């Protein structure tokens, strides 16, 4: 009985790895990129499936993107790893269906759905584009339409079966170093600041901002820092020159010979 309950696990693991591979290999400048909310869900399911429940402390206020990611992961609570893998696969199906429904098939490259090839091999109910679109393309797409999925060659981008890392091997700052589904900063780095400015009505101060300043801001800061040591000297150079004159001896108030005592007798006498 135990074997029957554990039999679906290898299939779920294989589908999960295929979905992770698809997200990892999506082109940055392709016709479709997952939204910020979708990437947050992918990130939280991936962390839950590989590391289990969130046990690390929440990042500080200076790391707003890290706090969004932590909140998404922590919201899953005690969801099991198998449930997280299944949720990841379900989210991948929704993304594929969204691509089919929203991206005009006549304007996309014919090899766009090649990125979903690993999913068609391991997920039977994976959403597929219309057959009229697939018929225009040769290779693996025709085999998928004909049902000959096994004849398709194994994709080289499938990752190996890595063992789930233990929570002890990850520090809080290591959470941003994963390759899979952890590219929120590359998608919309200014989204958090836009939301914060809209809420507070304040402008971003690059001196107190956790986001690195732009090249223009960095150049201005560097110029100010370079001029700082010369500020006193430059100020001194603007002062008017002061002429140094030779001191002149003051004249004697009175001649000793002319000073007399109150009695009329001269002091010299």
From Swiss-Prot:
Pfam families per record? ACBP
From the broadest rank down, the organism's phylogenetic lineage runs: Eukaryota, Metazoa, Chordata, Craniata, Vertebrata
Q: Name one GO cellular component term.
A: cytoplasm
Positions bound to an acyl-CoA: 23-32, 43-47, 69, 88
| Protein name (record) | Acyl-CoA-binding domain-containing protein 4
Q: Where is the ACB domain?
A: 12-101
Q: Which cysteines are joined by disulfide bonds?
A: none
Task: Tell me if Phosphoprotein is a UniProt keyword of this record.
Answer: yes
Q: Which parts of the chain span the membrane according to its record?
A: none
Q: Where is the composition biased (Pro residues)?
A: 156-167
């Amino acid at each position: 009985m135990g074997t029957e309950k554990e039999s679906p696990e290898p299939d779920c693991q294989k589908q999960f790895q295929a979905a992770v591979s698809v997200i990892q290999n999506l082109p940055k400048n392709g016709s479709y990129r997952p939204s910020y909310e979708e990437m947050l869900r992918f990130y939280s399911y991936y962390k839950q499936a590989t590391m289990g429940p969130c046990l690390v402390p929440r990042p500080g206020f200076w790391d707003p993107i890290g706090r969004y990611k932590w909140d998404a992961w922590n919201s899953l609570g005690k969801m099991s790893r198998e449930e997280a893998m299944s949720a990841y696969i379900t989210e991948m199906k929704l993304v594929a269906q969204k691509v089919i429904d929203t991206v005009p098939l006549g304007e996309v490259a014919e090899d766009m759905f090649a990125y979903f090839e690993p999913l068609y091999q391991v997920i039977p109910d994976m959403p597929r584009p219309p057959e009229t679109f697939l018929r225009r393309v040769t290779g693996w797409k025709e085999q998928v339409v004909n049902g000959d999925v096994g004849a398709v060659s194994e994709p080289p981008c499938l990752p190996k079966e890595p063992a789930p890392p233990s929570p002890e091997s990850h520090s809080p700052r290591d959470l941003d170093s994963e390759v899979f589904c952890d590219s929120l900063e590359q998608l919309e780095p200014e989204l958090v600041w836009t939301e914060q400015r809209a809420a507070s009505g304040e402008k971003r101060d690059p001196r107190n901002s956790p986001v690195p300043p732009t090249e223009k801001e960095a150049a201005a800061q560097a110029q100010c820092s370079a001029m700082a040591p010369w500020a006193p000297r430059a100020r001194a150079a603007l002062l008017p020159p002061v002429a140094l004159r030779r001191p002149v001896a003051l004249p004697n108030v009175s001649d000793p010979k002319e000073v007399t005592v109150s009695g009329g007798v001269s002091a010299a006498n």
